[in-house]
């Protein structure tokens, strides 16, 4: 059954404007979600334009399949494989723009059955594609305490990671957790100092979700693939929602905008320097939501949009 959860696309106009749409261009929306960005891109394309959308969430695919437009196609899979999708269509080096809206979507958070939120009781799942891989419950039941602590510290920046990991393992030993409410209660009980502005399970849920979905590895692979996929002058327009995501995007754009780094004083001929190649991208800056958007959609508060352009290198 199709859910009917509201989803407000964050930085909608800004992210699409960042692509610098050409009517006859070929674009990728790597995170279709509920189609906000895709529909706006399609509205700016001419008859010769094309849009390839990607999502690993079956519910997003169901929404995408309602779009009856010959310029549009949808792929069920991870955006980390975008280079493969493009190669299969013989479009490598011909893509004029890639848009990524990272992290979990509002419909995923709001649907208790998906298991993403500690605010709503549901199955402890957290998979963006429930047809593949381990659920959060399965992973927490089989993982070593030290591994759980590492995930909470690394992906949740949780200062009580060891204490929480121990509590999770002890609880699963007594009776395996299968519900989001159970995990939230265990984390809250194991957290000695409470933040009055944030639920104690916030960081744990973020960390487990990122781990279960390999989110940061997905981002790194997609960014790396973008260099071979984009045409000269093609744009990257990427929205991040937390510091771990934004750090990866920022570092990638900065490094690819600098070009190869040669140690000072190292003697190199012009031919050798040319062989190293020039910079791959030109960073065009970042944007953040305005006060009005944040007031209308509080989830936009932490979002950051970064834009870069493929060079001739």
Swiss-Prot record:
A Pfam family hit: Methyltransf_5
One GO MF term: rRNA (cytosine-N4-)-methyltransferase activity
Disulfide cysteine pairs (residue numbers): none
InterPro entries in UniProt: RsmH, SAM-dep_MeTrfase_MraW_recog, SAM-dependent_MTases_sf
Residue numbers binding S-adenosyl-L-methionine: 35-37, 55, 79, 101, 108
Recorded GO CC terms: cytoplasm
Catalytic activity field: cytidine(1402) in 16S rRNA + S-adenosyl-L-methionine = N(4)-methylcytidine(1402) in 16S rRNA + S-adenosyl-L-homocysteine + H(+)
GO biological process: rRNA base methylation
Family: Belongs to the methyltransferase superfamily. RsmH family.
Protein name: Ribosomal RNA small subunit methyltransferase H
Gene: rsmH
């Amino acid at each position: 059954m199709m859910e009917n959860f509201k989803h407000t696309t964050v930085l909608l106009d800004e992210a699409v404007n960042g692509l610098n749409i050409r009517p006859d261009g070929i674009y990728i929306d790597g995170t279709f979600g509920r189609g906000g960005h895709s529909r706006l891109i399609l509205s700016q394309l001419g008859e010769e334009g094309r849009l390839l959308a990607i999502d690993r969430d079956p519910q997003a695919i169901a929404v995408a399949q309602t779009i009856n437009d010959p310029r549009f196609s949808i792929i069920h899979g991870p955006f980390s494989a975008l280079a493969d999708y493009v190669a299969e269509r013989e479009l490598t080096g011909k893509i004029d723009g890639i848009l990524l809206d990272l992290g979990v979507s509002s419909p995923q958070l709001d649907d208790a059955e998906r298991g993403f939120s500690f605010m709503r009781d549901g199955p402890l799942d957290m998979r963006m594609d429930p047809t593949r891989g381990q659920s959060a419950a399965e992973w927490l039941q089989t993982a070593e305490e030290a591994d759980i602590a590492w995930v909470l510290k690394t992906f949740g920046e949780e200062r009580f990671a060891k204490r929480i990991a121990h509590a999770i393992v002890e609880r699963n030993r007594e009776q395996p957790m299968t519900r989001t409410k159970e995990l939230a209660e265990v984390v809250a009980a194991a957290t000695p100092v409470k933040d009055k502005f944030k639920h104690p399970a916030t960081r744990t849920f973020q960390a487990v979700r990122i781990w279960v979905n390999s989110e940061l590895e997905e981002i790194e692979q997609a960014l790396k693939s973008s260099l071979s996929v984009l045409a000269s002058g093609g744009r990257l327009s990427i929205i991040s929602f937390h510091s771990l995501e934004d750090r990866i995007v920022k570092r990638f754009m900065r490094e690819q905008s600098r070009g190869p780094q040669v140690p000072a004083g190292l003697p190199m001929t012009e031919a050798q320097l040319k062989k190293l190649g020039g910079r791959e991208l030109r960073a065009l800056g970042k944007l953040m939501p305005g006060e009005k958007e944040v007031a209308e959609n509080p989830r936009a508060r932490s979002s950051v949009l970064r834009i870069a352009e493929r060079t001739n290198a």
